[in-house]
A protein has these predicted regions:
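Inward-facing hydrophobic residues that define packing positions of alpha-helical scaffold repeats
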Residues: 53, 79, 95, 100, ...
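"A position-specific structural signal for the A-helix of alpha-solenoid helical repeats
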Residues: 82-85, 89, 128, 132, ...
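Start-of-helix signal in alpha-solenoid helical-repeat scaffolds, especially tetratricopeptide repeats
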Residues: 84, 120-123, 127, 171-178, ...
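Flexible helix-coil transition and linker loops at the boundaries of alpha-helical arrays
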Residues: 113-126, 156-175, 203-208, 241-251, ...
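Structured C-terminal portions of repeat-based eukaryotic scaffold domains
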Residues: 236-240, 246-377
Length: 377
């Protein structure tokens, strides 16, 4: 999203650099005062949380060694069977570990076999297989290929919806079509093309006019374009549609309203209000990585580096216990690593030790395509 992808990759580092320069000037003038944000705080020494998390990962992997042997046997069975459900399950497990090339290999040659009484399950498998094949290129540094493949999945679902026999089958393919459309919009956002994303989000809003998520995503697209007024209108629409759901609204939907409010405040440089909104969103169980990352951004701009550090460290440490398909795994990103490196320079008594603890943890949990050049040496 706008703030998570842009602010964390450059703004935190630039703010920290300014603070570092200011400290150097203070020390050069003979004051040598340590700023309050430079002290180790009750949350724990910088890097300590990640050192603990690394130990937990090693212990878990030691227990999982036998399971890996079972996985290898499953892979052989999948290759022989070629059934979509088995291949999809195997690929998802590999993707959760960041083993994307192996996940792609698990899907190669997989096909859907038709059972006489199992057409609905076969349709689900067809869609899941196609969607995963469209997802994988993005993780293998082929963003354009992933976008094109997801567009093809959308076209397939639209065709099946038109040709389906029976209202139930037609509705099922429409749901899959809309899921593919959300995937296309998301890839346009990731590719810094919010205008193209809005075309798809507009179509989704017409197809599902009571779904708040489409208006929320449109608001973030407007933020990417610097259109605060457009974002405000979209976020207000999402909030009203969430309220209209009444008790049927989930905690996740209510949390998204608060996250949207935080994004709006952050982009408008209203940092205390942004922090309050993000904190409320996370209290509601908001799991989107952007909420925690953007809360860390707001904390930096609000002059609270220790809170920013604690948020980023906890986001990384949460990966240890995250489910295989959890959004929490997206927290492992070069921008988070770079920003923690910058923050450690000002908040750690021993920046080198804190960075080593983080690097050790990242090496244990990062996917195979992770850009290791972001790691401090």
């Amino acid at each position: 999203m706008y703030c998570a992808r842009r602010a964390t990759s450059s703004s935190i580092a630039s703010v920290v650099a300014s603070l570092r320069d200011a400290r150097a000037r203070r020390e050069g003038s003979g004051g040598r005062r340590r700023a309050a944000m430079d002290d180790d705080v009750a949350r724990g020494a910088p890097g300590a949380a990640l050192a603990d998390a690394a130990r937990a990962v090693r212990a878990r992997r030691a227990r999982r060694d036998d399971d890996d042997d079972d996985d290898d046997a499953t892979a052989t069975t999948t290759a022989r069977d070629g059934r979509a459900r088995d291949a999809v399950a195997r690929a998802r497990a590999l993707m959760a570990r960041g083993r994307y090339a192996e996940a792609k290999a698990a899907l190669d040659g997989a096909a859907v076999g038709r059972d006489d009484d199992d057409d609905d399950d076969d349709d689900d498998a067809t869609f899941a297989l196609a969607a995963l094949r469209a997802e994988l290129p993005y993780h293998l540094n082929d963003a354009r290929g992933s976008l094109d493949a997801m567009c093809a999945v959308h076209a397939m679902c639209a065709r099946e919806a038109r040709e389906a026999r029976g209202a139930e089958a037609r509705e099922a393919w429409r749901r899959r079509r809309d899921a593919a459309a959300r995937g296309v919009a998301r890839r346009h956002m990731l590719g810094d093309d919010p205008r193209a994303a809005l075309v798809w989000l507009d179509a989704l809003a017409r197809s599902e006019p009571d779904e708040p998520a489409h208006f929320s995503a449109a608001g973030r697209a407007h933020l990417m374009m610097g259109d605060l007024e457009g974002a405000r209108l979209c976020f207000e629409a999402a909030e009203k549609k969430t309220a209209a759901l009444g008790e049927a609204a989930t905690e996740a939907q209510r949390g998204r309203v608060l996250r949207d409010r935080g994004d709006y405040f952050l982009t408008g440089l209203r940092f205390p209000e942004a922090r309050t909104a993000f904190a409320a969103a996370m209290a509601k169980g908001e799991t989107d990585v952007a909420a925690k990352v953007n809360s860390a951004v707001a904390a930096v701009y609000d002059g609270d580096l220790n809170s920013s550090r604690a948020l980023l460290e906890s986001g990384l440490a949460n990966v240890v216990n995250a489910d295989v398909n959890s959004k929490a795994r997206a927290f492992i990103s070069p921008s988070v690593v770079k920003n923690l490196n910058s923050i450690y320079e000002l908040t750690a008594r021993s920046p080198a030790e804190a960075k080593r603890a983080m690097n050790d943890f990242i090496k244990l949990v990062a996917p195979e395509d992770f850009d290791v050049t972001c790691m401090a040496t």
